[in-house]
């Protein structure tokens, strides 16, 4: 897979590719990454890439010209192009899996009030939000997508580990709690079932803990789990 990132501030992105795991994945040829400065494509003599919005309003908008030139340079129309934006499709594990099957991704990092809509209309395949909050940097959101995608590529992580992660099993539950040595820590002990060596009992315990954790932390996913099983939780509200 190749990932190309278009950014006003490449220095935010590049250190990520120097961390030990990512560097190893790149050296193996599993993934290649390129960070391109949008400013290099601006036709403004001062390399300015933003302007005031038509119709008025606060903040500045990223201009179409430099981003269009950068996208044409990387031949974005033949690749899967993403714009990270708080108004985009909410990101989830399924979308991460879908993106991991693509050969090439181009990610546009937003800034300021947003991006000229004509770039989205002309080039963008997916407008993606990483959550219901606003970031000052599209680069941070781009790194979330990159990190969630590359770890799904063959040869990066043991496939069995991926199957047990939150959001990854067919039932959509969160992952169960984990424990390691020592057995006792500040008065709290490891659940005895995990020391029993009884694999079926351990599996059942982990499954029940996944249900409990999902109900507590992600009630929306818990309701989806019940719906999938054809069940309900009585009055359809938290207990």
From Swiss-Prot:
EC number(s) on file: 2.1.1.228
Provenance organism: Borrelia turicatae (strain 91E135)
Role played: Specifically methylates guanosine-37 in various tRNAs.
GO cellular component: cytosol
Reaction(s) catalysed (UniProt annotation): guanosine(37) in tRNA + S-adenosyl-L-methionine = N(1)-methylguanosine(37) in tRNA + S-adenosyl-L-homocysteine + H(+)
Main localization category: cytoplasm
Name of this chain's protein: tRNA (guanine-N(1)-)-methyltransferase
Pfam families attached to this UniProt entry: tRNA_m1G_MT (PF01746)
């Amino acid at each position: 897979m190749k990932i190309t990132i278009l950014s006003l501030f490449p220095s935010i992105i590049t250190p990520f590719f120097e961390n030990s795991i990512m560097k190893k994945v790149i050296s193996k040829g599993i993934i290649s990454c390129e960070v391109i400065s949008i400013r290099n494509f601006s036709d403004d003599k001062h390399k300015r890439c933003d302007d005031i919005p038509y119709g008025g309003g606060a903040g500045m908008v990223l201009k179409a010209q430099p981003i269009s030139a950068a996208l044409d340079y990387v031949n974005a129309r033949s690749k899967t192009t993403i714009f990270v934006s708080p108004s985009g499709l909410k990101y989830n594990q399924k979308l991460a899996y879908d993106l991991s099957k693509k050969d090439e991704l181009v990610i546009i990092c937003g800034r300021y009030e947003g991006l000229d809509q004509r770039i989205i209309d002309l080039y963008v395949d997916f407008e993606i939000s990483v959550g219901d909050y606003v970031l000052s940097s599209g680069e941070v959101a781009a790194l979330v997508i990159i990190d969630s995608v590359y770890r799904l590529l063959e040869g990066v992580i043991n496939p069995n580990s991926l199957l047990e992660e939150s959001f990854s099993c067919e039932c959509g539950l969160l992952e169960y709690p984990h424990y390691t040595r020592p057995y006792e820590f500040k008065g709290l002990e490891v659940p005895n079932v995990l020391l029993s060596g009884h694999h079926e009992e351990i599996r059942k315990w982990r499954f029940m803990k996944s249900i409990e954790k999902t109900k507590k932390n992600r009630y929306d996913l818990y309701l989806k789990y019940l719906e999938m099983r054809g069940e309900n939780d009585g009055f359809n509200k938290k207990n």
